[in-house]
Every structure is written in C-alpha cells, then in structure tokens.
Curated annotation (Swiss-Prot):
FMN binds at A63, M64, T65, S93, N122, K192, T221, G273, I274, R275, S294, Q295. SUPFAM superfamilies: FMN-linked oxidoreductases (SSF51395). Involved in the biosynthesis of isoprenoids. Catalyzes the 1,3-allylic rearrangement of the homoallylic substrate isopentenyl (IPP) to its allylic isomer, dimethylallyl diphosphate (DMAPP). The lineage of its organism: Archaea, Thermoproteota, Thermoprotei, Thermoproteales, Thermoproteaceae. This is Isopentenyl-diphosphate delta-isomerase. Belongs to the IPP isomerase type 2 family.
C-alpha cells in the first residue's frame, strides 16, 4: 500500500509546479536564424533513428509511471499517443510490478496500445545491487516481456534516494550490475539520470557498457523537490530540510549534453526540462541524437489534451529545422549557434567543446 501511495504521489506532484525547479539552460543556446534556407517547410523530414528503429520524429515519451490504477490509465493513454505519432515510449520504474504481479497490467497496457513503436523497459539502479546475477537476469527478462521492450533503461537516482523518506541510497557495485543487465537484456541498454544530469566523468565510465546515455539533466522536474514535498507531508523534517538544501543540485541539461558528448561520444538522449520542440532541436544541435519529454505530456494526459501537445511539439521541431535550414535531423548538428555566458563559462571551466 505504501508503494502504491508513493507512485500516485509522484504522479500528482510531478504534474504540479511544485516539482519544477531551475533552468535547463536552453535559453543559453541561440540557434542562428537562416533567412535563406533554400527548402520548403513541406520538405523538412523529421524521421529519425531510435537505437536502430525508425521513428517519425527525433522525440519520444519519457519515463513516468506505472504500478497503480491511475498509472495504468495514464500509461494506456501515453501508449496510444506514441502509436498514433510513431514515436518511442519509456515506462516508469517496473520494480513494483516485479514484486507485485497483480499490477503488471499497468505496464502491459503499453505493449497492448503501442504494438509497433519502440518501447523502453525501466529498472532502478539501487534495486540492482540487491539481486544476484541469476535473479537480476530474471528481472530483466520479465521487465522486457512486460512491455515487449526494444531497449532497457537503468535509471540512476542517487539524489532522489538520498532525500526520499523510504529511500534506498545504495550505489556500491551498481556499474558491475549494469554490466550484468547488458548481458541479460539482449537489446540496447540505456543508462539514464532522472533530473540531476550526467557528467563527463560518469559518461566515460559508461563507455563500452551503455548503448545510449540519457542525460536526465537539471532544470525541469526535480525528484528532490517531489520527495521534499512528500517528506513535509509525512512530517519527516530531516528529509524535508535536506531536500530544501539540495533542490538546486545538478547539471543543467544543456551542459550535461556537452558533458556526456565529451566523455562518451556515443548515442546521447536529451531529457530534463525540455518544454518545446525548439528546446529539443537545441538539444540535438548540442550533440544529442534524440530527446524525450515527460512532465508536459503527463500534465497534458491528465488534462485530456495529450494529442494536441504532441502535435505541437512535432510542429515546433519541424519549424525550428526549417528556420535553421536543416532538411533532415542529421543536418541539425551543423547548425550555427551562440552560447550565453553561463553555458560558455561552464564549457571553458570544464574544458569542453560543444
């Protein structure tokens, strides 16, 4: 019952302004307008590859929820939208369904309603260290089967676990367990953050292990803020105060893309505070191969306007591409751009090129 309440708390708090903290620094990235693009808007091609699978836009539905009746209804709506628009979809952490088989349906609705698009299974790093290699392989297999996954994501959420009232901040040995997941999965492995970003140093340690890094940068939904609000409601004053102290902790998404690009050089997925198709195109210009959005789509789903929100994002991507003269998604990387003082200073101090 406690984990059910936590899952629903996360849904309501993530969709509210309480969860929104800081800036991802996309305002620090200015794409240079091309007044002579030499193409028609109708010629712009937004098709992209998501870990080998062709999709209709360089954009997907990020990890959100699962495990409760409300979560199941939301996942069904998100999956229908992913299928309609031909874009990938992550599910939220599947641990709850692995220990409570009666809630598996809240994840299985995704493969039922999105049979043809890439789906991403999702497990949390702290739970990996509890399992031996055989049990971990079983969990991976079940998580994959539950959603007919094209890829498996392992989420790194050290900051969230450190402030969560029920947190499990156990991260010793996680990298070795991620390697076990890679062997067991038999499909692309994504290692992702959940709102505090990936540094160059961590990205370098994931080279040769992860098939993709999802930076999950700072400047959007903050699980530190969410857990702080939950702690306050539960009267857990120590956790509330720690959350208040650390709610601005993390690497802004724009900087994290550059960090990951420098340390890793492979397939990078941008997430964290992306609030428009223009933000997404800026992320691609910085070096990401793909981007996802979560909070705006969760809020839209709860308000019954999910289709309109995704239509808008795709149209914004296409418009931004047209205005920088990018006919294909690959062309975005060569778009001229200017950086604001905060991002420029970060790159200089960290010795990064982006």
């Amino acid at each position: 019952m406690e984990i059910d309440r936590r899952k629903n708390d996360h849904i309501y708090l993530a969709s509210s302004e309480i969860s929104q903290v800081g800036s991802p620094w996309f305002d620090e990235v200015i794409l240079i307008h091309n007044a002579l693009p030499e193409l028609d808007l109708s010629e712009v091609d937004t098709t992209a590859k998501f870990l080998g699978a062709e999709v209709k836009a360089p954009f997907g539905i990020g990890a959100m929820t699962g495990g409760t009746e409300l979560a199941g209804k939301i996942n069904a709506e998100l999956a229908k939208a992913a299928e309609a628009f031909g874009i990938p979809i992550y599910v939220g952490s599947q641990r709850i369904a692995l220990v409570k088989p009666e809630v598996r349906w809240t994840f299985e609705v995704v493969k039922k309603n999105a049979p043809t698009v890439p789906k991403v299974a999702n497990l949390g790093a702290p739970q990996l260290v509890e399992l031996d290699e055989v049990k971990l392989a079983e969990w991976v297999s079940q998580a994959v089967d539950m959603v007919d996954a094209h890829a498996v994501a392992i989420h790194l959420n050290a900051a969230q676990e450190a402030v969560q009232p029920e947190g499990e901040p156990r991260f010793r040995g996680v990298l070795e367990k991620i390697k076990v997941v890679k062997r067991a999965a038999g499909r692309p492995l994504i290692v992702k953050e959940v709102g505090n970003g990936i540094s160059r140093e961590v990205a370098a340690r994931l080279a040769g292990v992860a098939d993709a890094i999802d930076v999950g940068g700072y400047g959007g939904t903050s699980f530190i803020a969410i857990e702080g609000a939950r702690a306050a409601g539960a009267g857990a004053q120590l956790r509330r105060r720690i959350a208040e102290t650390f709610k601005l902790w993390g690497i802004p998404t724009a900087a994290s893309i550059c960090e990951a690009k420098s340390g890793y050089g492979g397939y990078i997925i941008a997430s964290g505070g992306i609030r428009s198709g223009l933000d997404g195109v800026k992320a691609l210009a910085l070096g990401a191969s793909f981007f996802t959005m979560s909070q705006p789509l969760l809020k839209a789903a709860l308000e019954g306007r999910l289709k309109e929100e995704i239509e808008t994002v795709v149209a914004e991507v296409k418009t931004a591409m047209f205005l920088i003269g990018a006919r294909t998604v690959k062309d975005i990387a060569s778009a001229p751009r200017v950086y604001g003082p905060r991002l420029r200073s970060w790159l200089e101090q960290r010795g990064l090129t982006c």
